[in-house]
Amino acid sequence: MRTPDYLSPTSIGVWRRDRREFYLIYLADNRPPRIPQTQAMAIGAAFDAYVKSHLHERIFGKGANPVFEFTTLFEAQVEKHNRDWAMRHGAHVFNSYRDCGALSDLMLDLNDAEGEPQFEMQITGRIVHSSCIGGIILLGKPDIHFINKSGAFVVYDWKVNGYMSASTTSPKKGYVKIYDAFTLTHSNQHGKSHKDCQMMLVDGIYINIAHYMEDVDQGWTDQTTIYSWILGAEVGSKFTVAIDQIVCKGSGNEFPYLRVAMHRNRVSEPYQLKLHDEIADIWTRVKAGKSRIFDEMTPEESVKKCDVLDLVFKSYQDDHKYSDWFNVMSRSHSDF
């Protein structure tokens, strides 16, 4: 059994969803190969490359850091089999995001930053918990982080939802503003906040004070909270998490219609403390070994199950004609 050096929002999500898959990916002696990137994954990665390269050039100047050149980001994030498709469709998402006004709103926030905003940094942090000697090591890759001139501590992320869906994807509740990112007649919600949003200017940023982020989406909350802790926010403290959610509906053409819902929220202290305890429990279990992984079993049964999982990919051969089929069909999926 391997022992992980850190936990991440992704691994914590897998632990919750499917303990068997967590063991295979992060702990098994014979690690499974990565599942190939789908188009649903690739569209978010492609848009990410377009928007970050644009923002970095606008703020720091062209060529300031080769890491943030479009080609570098795109090829690092989009797998080869998706690149032709993702190049076109990522441009569509970025152009829609820019033209509707969402990008300008983001630039206004970034222009109010105290010092330079931080982009796309992979960082680790040690979080203290009373049950864990030496603390818990967390890893994250925040899209953007800044502290504005009013002292607001902000972590920013993008989500592209429903791009490959045949049906319309609705935005999450509570957004502070939504843009129709298409040239047809706009809906009556264009430029307005959600009906359940109670908007207030707090430390220079309009946030929804009627909903915490955990009321909007648990996965988003966990991800941005962990990022905030790693970046220096205290567990239980007040910080702002910002998500621009791009949702899609079919147009009858190659490119879907898009809308951008802007979510700006806090994360409650009770939720942070609960998440903190949950992560400490996961960390304790994976460090304790096989007997603590499957908590619905006795320690002996848990060890036996882990021993079996260690062997699942022992004889896997990358070049076998059925290898890709075996990898996909023997794994847990969340995007089908």
Segments (PLM) and residue ranges:
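Nuclease catalytic cores
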Residues: 5-60, 120-121
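Short amphipathic alpha-helical segments and their helix-coil junctions
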Residues: 1-2, 19-33, 155, 201-211
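Non-catalytic protein-protein interaction segments used by genome-maintenance enzymes to assemble
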Residues: 121-222
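Metal-dependent nuclease catalytic regions and adjoining charged, substrate-binding loops involved
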Residues: 7, 180-221, 225-336
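Short catalytic/ligand-binding loop motif for oxyanion handling, primarily in non-cytosolic enzymes
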Residues: 23-24, 32-33, 162-167, 249-253
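Hydrophobic (often cysteine-bearing) scaffold residues that line and stabilize catalytic clefts
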Residues: 39, 43, 86, 220-223
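A non-catalytic, helix-rich entry segment at domain boundaries
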Residues: 46-128
